Amino acid sequence: MPITTPKQKTTQRIKMRIHKGDTVQVITGKDKGKTGEVLRTLPIENRVIVQGVNIRTRHVKPTQEGESGRIVTEEASVHASNVMLYSNNKKIASRVALVVEKDGSKKRRLKKTGELID
């Protein structure tokens, strides 16, 4: 039998157009249509953690004597391709375009509304 090696996970950082603190809307999956704030981005895995979306329940065993176990609910990550930036003013989700200003700075702009993010 040949010896097989497990697949190597790419460690290359992926540029993400979604940043911490952005308001996003989920476009696919069981939480489709939900909106929330991005709590954390995971650029190596190309995933984001969104507040109130993809809730998972975890059972924690007691760590010390006399302490009781507990059930913890927390947000799990969602792939970045499954969320879109959300405009709170127009109440619509949109794709993002990178715009270079005259002074050379890069800004993010919502394609549907033309609203500047940064």
Curated annotation (Swiss-Prot):
Cellular component terms per the entry's GO annotation: ribonucleoprotein complex; ribosome
Matches recorded under InterPro entries: KOW, Rib_uL2_dom2, Ribosomal_uL24, Ribosomal_uL24_CS, Ribosomal_uL24_KOW, Translation_prot_SH3-like_sf
Superkingdom of source: Bacteria
Coiled-coil annotated residue ranges, if any: none
Pfam families assigned: KOW, ribosomal_L24
PROSITE patterns per record: RIBOSOMAL_L24 (PS01108)
Keywords, in A-Z order: Ribonucleoprotein, Ribosomal protein, RNA-binding, rRNA-binding
Disulfide cross-links: none
Gene Ontology molecular function: rRNA binding; structural constituent of ribosome
GO biological process entries: translation
Subunit structure, interactors included: Part of the 50S ribosomal subunit.
Function: One of two assembly initiator proteins, it binds directly to the 5'-end of the 23S rRNA, where it nucleates assembly of the 50S subunit. One of the proteins that surrounds the polypeptide exit tunnel on the outside of the subunit.
Similarity annotation: Belongs to the universal ribosomal protein uL24 family.
Full protein name: Large ribosomal subunit protein uL24
Organism: Prochlorococcus marinus (strain MIT 9303)
Underlying gene: rplX
